[in-house]
């Protein structure tokens, strides 16, 4: 176990060094990033996303679940003050055949302040009830790409979830942005994120309904569709 603890600490430290070299940490305009991506960081079965001073951890293997307390301690130590809270969210990611009972919850800290920043845009992150770790962190470059193409266009963001693509489209100069998701909770979150960044901006409309039915009814008014 001692050897395993040292290995985890070393690899988390390596993960922080790499993200620092990539200029993902200690930025005023960005505090959302993926710290650990499984095998890519030599920690198979583990995903850790960072939102400000909170790290959200998902175990996809029994081994990582068993080591969760060690990982939480090592994470805070390796972060050198960047991380204060560790939220464990593995109820739906652990192998069901392992018959492990583990409720989601904080392993360290207890901060529910959930506004984080990506490329200068603010987002409410719902790591308690949201999908994945609360935000699709791996879509950062795609969101920026949509922003690049959005100027002067009528945009439809299908299955919008948090509305991340919608907010980027608004900053990119879209004429109109429609956000559609069958989940009323997702639409509530999307509206909150749009209002957080562009208060009172009537270019954004959000709809809690079937995205494909909305697409059929939208006709030819759309010039950019994100699925």
Please give the residue ranges for each predicted region.
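Short, small-residue-biased leader/transition segments that mark boundaries at the very start
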Residues: 1-7, 227
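Short histidine-centered catalytic/ligand-binding loop motif
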Residues: 4-5, 56-65
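Conserved short alpha-helical segments that host acidic/polar catalytic motifs at enzyme active sites
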Residues: 8-38
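Conserved short hydrophobic interaction patches
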Residues: 15, 74-78, 193
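Short helix-terminating capping/connector loops at secondary-structure junctions
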Residues: 27-29, 81-82, 199-202
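Non-catalytic substrate-recognition/targeting regions of SAM-dependent transferases
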Residues: 36-49, 65-136
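Rossmann-like S-adenosyl-L-methionine
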Residues: 108-225
């Amino acid at each position: 176990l001692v050897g395993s603890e040292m290995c985890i600490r070393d690899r988390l430290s390596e993960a922080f060094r790499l993200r620092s070299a990539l200029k993902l940490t200690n930025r005023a305009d960005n505090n959302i990033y993926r710290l650990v991506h499984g095998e890519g960081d030599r920690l198979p079965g583990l995903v850790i996303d960072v939102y400000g001073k909170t790290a959200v951890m998902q175990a996809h293997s029994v081994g990582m679940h068993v080591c969760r307390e060690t990982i939480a301690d090592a994470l805070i130590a390796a972060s050198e003050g960047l991380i204060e809270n560790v939220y464990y969210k593995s109820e739906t990611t652990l192998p069901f055949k392992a018959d492990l009972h583990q409720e989601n919850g904080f392993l360290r800290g207890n901060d529910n302040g959930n506004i984080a920043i990506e490329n200068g845009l603010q987002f409410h992150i719902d790591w308690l009830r949201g999908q994945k770790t609360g935000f699709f962190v791996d879509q950062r470059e795609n969101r920026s790409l949509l922003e690049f193409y959005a100027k002067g266009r009528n945009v439809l963001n299908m299955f919008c979830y948090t509305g991340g693509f919608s907010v980027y489209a608004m900053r990119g100069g879209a004429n109109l942005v429609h956000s559609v998701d069958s989940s009323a909770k997702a639409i509530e979150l999307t509206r909150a994120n749009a209002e957080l960044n562009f208060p009172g901006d009537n270019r954004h409309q959000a709809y809690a309904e079937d995205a494909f039915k909305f697409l059929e009814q939208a006709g030819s008014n759309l010039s950019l569709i994100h699925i």
